[in-house]
UniProtKB/Swiss-Prot annotation:
Enzyme's top EC category: hydrolase
Taxonomy of the source species: Eukaryota, Viridiplantae, Streptophyta, Embryophyta, Tracheophyta
Descriptive protein name: ATP-dependent zinc metalloprotease FTSH 4, mitochondrial
Major place of residence: mitochondrion
Cellular component GO terms, alphabetical: mitochondrial inner membrane; mitochondrion
Misc. comment: In contrast to fungi and metazoa, plant mitochondria have more than one i-AAA-like complexes.
Location(s), subcellular: Mitochondrion inner membrane
Quaternary organization: Homooligomer. The complex formed by FTSH4 does not contain FTSH11.
Organism: Arabidopsis thaliana (Mouse-ear cress)
Ribosomal protein in keyword set: no
Cofactor list: Zn(2+)
Length: 717
């Protein structure tokens, strides 16, 4: 038997036997003891109980127990010498106290070998399970995995020989800091490796993923001509020489002349800057590259500079050509040391490309921006964008031409007078006028009309300038009456004040955020505003508040005049601090919005005093006018309550029909303006209200007569 050979080998090698004993004891003692019947963990197995006694009693008990074990081991050896292995087996298995004794275990194994029952003994299976558990517990420290085959014969029938030794590995205990540092290094190396692979993949996939080479394609079919661009004749004249250069470059280069490399179009939004660039390409018949400043940057660093290089590289292959960059301030803003490096890279690449290609390559760079002051100085210097062309809002004639261009695409009625619409739309850009025509066409289509009429254009203009009507808003009669007198006060002061803008329309229909509105439009385009016009605007702003006080009393004034007071205060402060229209402050400009840093306390108080004086004077002027023309105020308010909306022409007809000596009243206004009336007290307001009530009947009768006489005074939608 294999176990018999093991015992023989162990007997000849006492040193190996001692190691095996310690191993077997550890493995065997970690499991329940073998009972008399050979069952593990049976009822016959019991562990020695540890009693917590004094140190003296404990040491005495241990000495007694050790002496008994020595005697029992000696008895087992005696039985072996007597050749009675069965008695040794019975004694060992019946006494659990011997299971932890190495000498007793050795005698027990000898007895099993003699009776040839070692392979069938419960001890073998218990040792195999115990050694496997110990090996799992000690694997971290080089454990006992080599002893998992205990009880199984090897090639030579023994656990190990000189030719087939049992290999064991012993490792030193590692410290926590070393283990942590090793983990961090592993994670760091992995992160760097993944980042490098990702960067390599992105770098190779940027061109395909973002489609740089596919996007840089010129537009060869630009059908826009200079004749399609209206209202910017001066800008077109400056761009014509670029067209001639693109058509015949040798005409300019033969004398050594050099055209600008870059043209910067500056102006408000919607004035036709992009259309001008397309017209250049259409007139010259050359390829046209179009892009936006925001298209260069992406989430990847360096993409902007690469796109700039690809754009100019494609342009060089198609020269002569035009590159148009819209909203160039997105990449051409002034550089700041705090900006990100990738933002500077794009601008630097743009600067190099603008000043890097040869002069005669036939590439014209046209850019557009609404904020030329925000561009970097290196970008707009001579040699790059060295020509600036201003594209302003069109004047009256330009607006008429633009309206004609857009109206040629819709069905127009015979009563349409585009010059009237052009005069009534100061400050409108080409895009605003195109929107006006489109809104009018949609209105005519909704109404089922065959063509676009003048009323449709007026509706579109009022909707853009005054906001959409809110006819469904529920407003009380008291609020409508107060709004009518408020707007009537504005209109009357504007009519009877020299220098005020003509009244275009008055309405008490809510539009936008306002309950009512008086619209004023100039007869012609204004390039500057005089002091008389500004003072007239202050008077008109005060007209609504004064009308409320005269009709309803100071205790009944509302918050409806808050916007008027805000506009008047801003205008009066600008007159004092910006326009030098105050004798006390002088011809000095002050920055009033810097919390007083640019002025002393005395100067600030002086400015406030001058502003208050201007507003009080405007208040007195408005009060004088409305007191004199109180009858007209009632008539106008009643007409607004009846028709809700009146045009400037209808208001003038209403006032003309009133039986009043206008020349005499104007003379009285001039006389009373020389002696301003102070702000009224509640008693004076009451008397004014009484006087107004006395004239109410006559005014109402006159308004009714005028409404009957002029049937054309229908509400203007």
């Amino acid at each position: 038997m294999a176990w018999r050979r093991i015992i023989t080998k162990v007997s000849s090698h006492e040193r190996e036997l001692s190691s095996l004993r310690s191993l077997l004891v550890r493995a065997y003692s970690s499991f329940p003891r073998v009972g008399v019947t050979g069952a593990v963990g049976g009822g016959g197995a019991s562990l020695p109980r540890t009693r917590f006694q004094s140190s003296y009693v404990g040491s005495f008990a241990r000495r007694v127990r050790d002496r008994e074990e020595v005697n029992e081991v000696a008895h087992l050896r005696e039985l072996i010498r007597r050749n009675d292995p069965e008695a040794v087996i019975r004694m060992f298995e019946s006494q659990p106290s011997l299971h932890a004794n190495a000498s007793a275990l050795s005698e027990y194994i000898k007895a099993l070998v003699k009776v040839d029952r070692l392979d069938q003994s419960e001890l073998v299976r218990t040792l195999q399970r115990g050694i496997a558990g110990v090996a799992r517990e000690e694997e971290t420290f080089g454990g006992l995995g080599a002893f998992r085959n205990v009880g199984k014969p090897t090639k030579d029938g023994v656990l190990g020989t000189a030719s087939a030794p049992i290999h064991t590995i012993s490792t030193e205990r590692t410290h926590f800091k070393e283990q942590l540092w090793s983990t961090i290094r592993t994670i760091g190396v992995g992160f760097l490796l993944i980042s490098g692979i990702g960067a390599l993949i992105e770098d190779r996939g940027i061109g395909k993923g973002l489609g740089l080479h596919e996007e840089v394609q010129p537009s060869m079919d630009s059908s826009t001509k200079f004749s399609d661009v209206k209202g910017v004749d001066e800008a077109k004249a400056e761009l014509e020489e670029i067209v001639h250069y693109l058509r015949d470059p040798k005409r300019f280069t033969r004398l050594g002349g050099k055209l600008p490399k870059g043209v910067l179009l500056v102006g408000p939004p919607g004035t036709g800057k992009t259309m001008l660039a397309r017209a250049i390409a259409g007139e010259a018949g050359v390829p046209f590259f179009s892009c936006s400043g925001s298209e260069f940057e992406e989430m990847f660093v360096g993409v902007g500079a690469r796109r700039v290089r690809d754009l100019f590289s494609a342009a060089k292959k198609c020269s002569p050509c035009i590159i148009f960059i819209d909203e160039i301030d997105a990449i051409g803003g002034s550089r700041n040391p705090k900006d990100q490096q990738y933002m500077k890279m794009t601008l630097n690449q743009m600067l190099v490309e603008l000043d890097g290609f040869k002069q005669n390559e036939g590439i014209i760079v046209v850019a557009a921006t609404n904020f030329p002051e925000s561009l970097d100085k290196a970008l707009v210097r001579p040699g790059r964008f060295d020509r600036h062309i201003v594209v302003p809002n069109p004047d009256v004639e330009g607006r008429r031409q633009i309206l004609e261009s857009h109206m040629s695409k819709v069905l127009k009625a015979e009563d349409v007078d585009l010059m009237i619409i052009a005069r009534g739309t100061p400050g409108f850009s080409g895009a605003d006028l195109a929107n006006l025509v489109n809104v009018a066409a949609l209105k005519a289509a909704m109404d089922g009309s065959k063509d676009v009429t003048m009323s449709d254009l007026e509706f579109a203009k009022d909707r853009i300038m005054m906001g959409s009507e809110r006819k469904s808003a529920v407003i009380s009669d008291e609020s409508r009456k107060l709004t009518a007198f408020h707007e009537g006060g504005h209109a009357l002061v504007a009519i009877h004040t020299e220098g005020a803008l003509p009244v275009h329309k008055a309405t008490i229909v809510p539009r936008g955020m306002a309950l009512g509105m008086v619209s004023q439009l100039p007869d012609k385009d204004e390039t500057s505003i005089s002091r008389k016009q500004m003072l007239a605007r202050l008077d008109v702003c005060m007209g609504g508040r004064v009308a409320e006080e005269l009709i309803f009393g100071e205790s009944e004034v509302t918050s409806g005049a808050s916007s008027d007071l805000e506009q008047a205060t801003k205008l009066a402060r600008a007159m004092v601090t910006k326009f030098g229209m105050s004798k006390e402050v002088g011809l000095v400009a002050h920055n009033y919005d810097d919390n007083g840093k640019s002025m002393s306390t005395e100067t600030r108080l002086l400015i406030e005093s001058e502003v208050k004086q201007l507003l009080e004077k405007a208040y007195n002027n408005a009060k004088t006018i409305l007191t004199v023309y109180n009858k007209e105020l009632h008539a106008l308010a009643n007409a607004l309550l009846q028709h809700e909306t009146l045009s400037g022409k209808q208001i003038k007809e209403l006032l003309t029909d009133l039986n009043s000596p206008l020349l005499q009243k104007r003379q009285e206004v001039v006389t009373k303006q020389s002696n301003p009336v102070p702000p009224s007290t509640p008693s004076s307001a009451s008397s004014a209200a009484a006087a107004a009530a006395a004239a109410a009947a006559a005014a109402a009768a006159a308004a009714a007569t005028a409404a009957t006489k002029g049937k054309d005074m229908a509400p203007v939608s």
